[in-house]
Design a protein with these regions (language model features):
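Extracytoplasmic/peripheral linker and loop segments enriched in polar/acidic and small residues
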Residues: 20, 310-313, 325-328, 406-416, ...
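Ligand-site clamp/hinge motif
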Residues: 186-189, 217-270, 404-406
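Alpha-helical secondary-structure segments
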Residues: 115-120, 196-197, 227-232, 250, ...
Length: 534
């Protein structure tokens, strides 16, 4: 593995030095190296759905706005904006110093200033049914958008939606060049031209992706120095997590994001701390992650025992989440003993949810048996292999209270399809926020969002919940909206269409010479201010 990695490293050096004669002197020590476990499917922001795509696209593109590490919406290409009193019209004033990455397709100047017309084109493209972008839903509440002037872009919503700016921070809404799209056609996925801190250099699919510093990037640090600091980003595609871990420990990768069962006990303790033997080599950082891991219960199955709330509550009380996190996740994650909304959001509901109460679980199970006459109740949990250990833990715990559990392990693709079609009575799932607002989580339980046309995988339906949800999406005042969110969250806990497992945490390992990497609740990899100590 070391020889293979060194060969690619030498290739990287050769390509960068030989092809960049017109650019500033290249410093190979400022190359940031990380690994993805599978190939990136596209470098087109219209297809920035999976994290591996999003991370690469984030280095290449900008949108109107962005999120800081505290999830506040801050300017990007839009330097300022105004929102109408009714909350429907957003008017953005654009910077006049943002240029597309240099390319001969732009003619003699090799680049072009970004204008409001580019955003108009980019948004139309996102909605184009021929493109089939998975991000078209972001603009489903948009009535119209237009370039009022070169430096002014306006969006009108069908109805007010306070989290809308957070939606615009998604990578789907990045600006692209019409000339580049028309020039490359279907090959644009592998020939991206954006405005971001890094520009495309080389992509050997399934092997390596290389991005180079954009010398014309518009953002500066607080001292006025141009960003980014790094010279390049090099991404490898080693599928084996154990191999990635070895490459990281040997210093051939600067950063590692995953924690796999094959090495988790070697690198961190059961309390979630870095093992002493690595403290002089590695920096570890953890933080809240907008991801709730849970078991979903499909409520439209006729004659299934999980339609009965007594069973769903018995499951929720019947296993020890704290023990599960400590021994199976080495303390990485927070037991989901409150609501469904994760702890990284300001509207997190500090209500008393489900804690381990085996006696209460047994009591609820006996009530179910007496009520239904079913003497030996049993359930099936469907999962993929990545979460088998968690499901087996729950299986053992529930069998101790008298509930028989079968685990069905299937491929991830089959699990996704089965969830969407109501095939499974209980399924393991997770919900990672697309934007930093609890509406993102509560939309999973709105009755008009039933799958396959929406994210309501459980087919939960509650008149009071729906009324609160419809009211909340137009409330501009954050505190008032958060109170409505918490009421909805309380209904979810009481009715138990889901079994919350834990609120996830971001975990990042980096080499000791990596500075200012940072961490955030949406687990975005932001490399603009990262640098490497020599």
């Amino acid at each position: 593995m070391v020889l293979r990695n060194n060969w690619y490293y030498l290739l990287l050096v050769f390509l960068m030095i030989s092809c960049e004669n017109k650019e500033s002197k290249f410093n190979i020590s400022q190359v940031f190296r990380y690994n993805e476990h599978s190939n990136i499917s596209s470098l087109d922001p219209a297809f920035a759905k999976d994290q591996r795509n999003i991370w690469a696209v984030h280095q290449l593109y900008n949108g109107l706005v962005q999120l800081d590490d505290s999830l506040r919406v801050i300017p990007s290409i839009a330097k300022s904006w105004q929102i109408s009193e009714d909350g429907k019209v957003y008017t953005f004033s654009l910077r006049d110093d943002v240029y597309f990455h240099e390319h001969s397709l732009f003619g003699n100047d090799a680049t072009r200033l970004v204008t409001a017309t580019d955003f108009e084109y980019s948004f139309k493209r996102l909605l184009d049914k021929n493109i089939v972008s998975p991000g078209a839903w972001v603009l489903q509440n948009v009535k119209s958008f237009s370039a009022l002037e070169d430096g002014v872009f306006q969006i009108e919503l069908t109805q007010a939606f306070p989290p809308f700016l957070g939606l615009l921070a998604m990578k789907y809404c990045s600006v692209v060049s019409k000339e580049a799209i028309e020039y490359f056609g279907d090959e644009y996925r592998s020939n991206p031209i954006g405005t971001g801190p890094f520009k495309f250099k080389l992509w050997v699919e399934n092997t390596k992706l290389v991005l180079r510093k954009n010398p014309n990037y518009f953002e500066k640090d607080t001292t006025g120095k141009k960003l980014p600091y790094l010279e390049a980003v090099a991404i490898t595609f080693l599928p084996d997590k154990q191999s990635e871990f070895l490459q990281f420990i040997q210093g051939n990768l600067d950063f590692m994001k995953s924690l796999d069962a094959s090495y988790k006990d070697d690198i961190i303790t059961t309390e979630g701390k870095l093992q002493p033997k690595y403290k002089h080599l590695v920096h570890m950082e953890t933080g809240a992650y907008l991801n709730t891991e849970y078991l979903g219960v499909y409520l439209d199955h006729k004659n299934n025992i999980t339609n009965n709330k007594l069973i769903r509550k018995a499951i929720n009380y019947g296993f020890d989440r704290e023990k599960m996190i400590k021994y199976l996740r080495n303390g990485i994650g927070t037991p989901a003993v409150n609501g469904f909304i994760p702890s990284g959001l300001p509207s997190f509901n500090n209500l008393e949810g489900y804690r381990y109460k085996p006696e209460l679980a047994r009591k609820l199970l006996q009530e179910f048996i007496q009520e239904t006459g079913i003497k030996n109740p049993s359930i099936t949990i469907t999962t993929n292999s990545n979460y088998l250990d968690l499901c087996e833990f729950i299986q053992r715990e529930l069998q101790n209270i008298g509930l028989d559990v079968t685990i069905d392990v299937i491929p991830p693709s089959s699990l996704r399809q089965g969830k969407a079609t109501g095939k499974f009575s209980i399924f393991r799932a997770s919900w990672i926020a697309d934007y930093p607002d609890a509406e993102n989580y509560l939309s999973l339980f709105y009755s008009k969002n039933f799958t396959p046309n929406g994210p309501n995988y459980t087919h939960f339906k509650n008149i009071v919940f729906d009324s609160l949800y419809e009211k909340s999406i137009s409330v501009v005042n954050n505190l008032e909206r958060y109170k409505l969110y918490q009421k909805m969250d309380s209904i979810i806990i009481e009715e138990a269409p889901v079994i919350p497992l834990y609120y996830d945490q971001v975990i990042r390992f980096s080499q000791k010479n990596i500075e200012d990497l940072g961490i955030n609740p949406i687990d975005m990899l932001d490399l603009r201010r990262v640098y490497k100590l020599n």
